[in-house]
Amino acid sequence: MYSYTFDSETGGIVLNSTPTNFSKEPRPVYSQEMDLLGFDKYWSYKKQNDTPYMWAESNVYWYRNTQIAKTKGGDLYTAPELQPVRDEAGNIVFGKETGAVLVPIEIEAMNKRNKDLLTVIEDSTVKKIVKEYEKYKKKLDIFHVAFSGGKDSAVLLDLVKKALPKDSFVVIFGDTGMEFPDTYETVEYTKKQCEADGTPFYISRSHFEPSESWKLFGPPARVLRWCCSVHKSTPQTLKMREITGKDNYVGMDFVGVRAHESLTRT
């Protein structure tokens, strides 16, 4: 993860050229989350979910390079407490009483400000993908992109498409049967893109329905992480056996897990 600063003009973030080993990982915040936390009690904003309004670092909320709120507490049964930030006069920053109306992040303008650095990062990553492909292509039966429908795997797929020949890899979506509707929309959209540009796209599923596996194994947990093996990795392995026609195929997976993510995640 690269270090960054919040941009007061676009409402976005500006990446710095220095990578950092410690990342707060800013998260875009949409009005749906704001409504759930009670932002509409203190701030005025349009109820739309096409574009985020601000960023959150853990429990701290930033709007246009200004901290405007944080949350405290909260668990499965108790809502977190929203704590607005007030100025020296006691007014809520950008609050309703000031007449301010929160506006969404200017995505296109933010992208333009980050274009040069993103181009450097993209070119470097594409070269790494090509290097690994050339190193192993004669030793393997299949290269595949593990597609989840999330942002990381979407970026990964775009990079692999730019790096490798169309017929040199396949894309496999591991359908757990427990994805959000938005994920399935993204998968369908990506599948159509792949069909249009000639990239093989497959969907793998377990023969277990989610309701069956929950009854057999109980809910997934950090200690008993059966869900991935039952509903993702094993079905994908079976799908690659089907694609290659080999039970003992040798393959390489391109997976969208970033190097600076936590050890628990990786």
PLM regions: where:
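ATP-dependent adenylation/nucleotidyltransferase module used to activate substrates
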Residues: Y2-T266
